[in-house]
Amino acid sequence: SPDTKLKGHGSGHYMSAIAQAYAVATNPEQKAILRQNITRMVNELRQCQEKTFVYNKDLKRNWEARDFAPEAELRDMKGTWAAFDEYKKHPELYGYGYINAIPAQHCALIEMYRAYNNSDWVWAPYYSVHKQLAGLIDIATYFDDKEICDKALLIAKDMGLWVWNRMHYRTYVKQDGTQDERRAKPGNRYEMWDMYIAGEVGGMS
């Protein structure tokens, strides 16, 4: 949908559906169509993901999730649709492995404890990531083309690395103190995952 920040959520369900439908289909024509759709989905997702594979000469490594949106930039980051239209023009900034139907800023905004607001802030970014990972894993589980199955797992692995890299280097856990104290610095997972709808930590568990 063009006007929901749960973008990617539906494509994850779609991948799960076509993978499971393929596994039980008996009609050769239907099975051929499903095969074509699965193959196209995986190949095009990988092409999109590869736009984030950017080597940084200064760092002498790939640009990673931890490098995306330094704190000063994060604090000023906007969540409007107009801002998102600008963000999506630069996938090379997202960090190695990011793949989603919405810019990486959507995941980063929750580190600033931005509330659920479909127009101006966030709506369960990691929940949508989870749905896409689940869809890719279902393809790898139910499809019978090894090359495509391996590619689906590779996409999921690289996105998983993005999540790990971002969480490991840019977030932490602080449970004590007042909420203002716990939110004084960006990236406190104790607060991030406790936000109604915006967080939805269960989506990634």
Feature-to-residue mapping (PLM):
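Glycan-recognition and catalytic cores of secretory/periplasmic carbohydrate-active enzymes
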Residues: 1-205
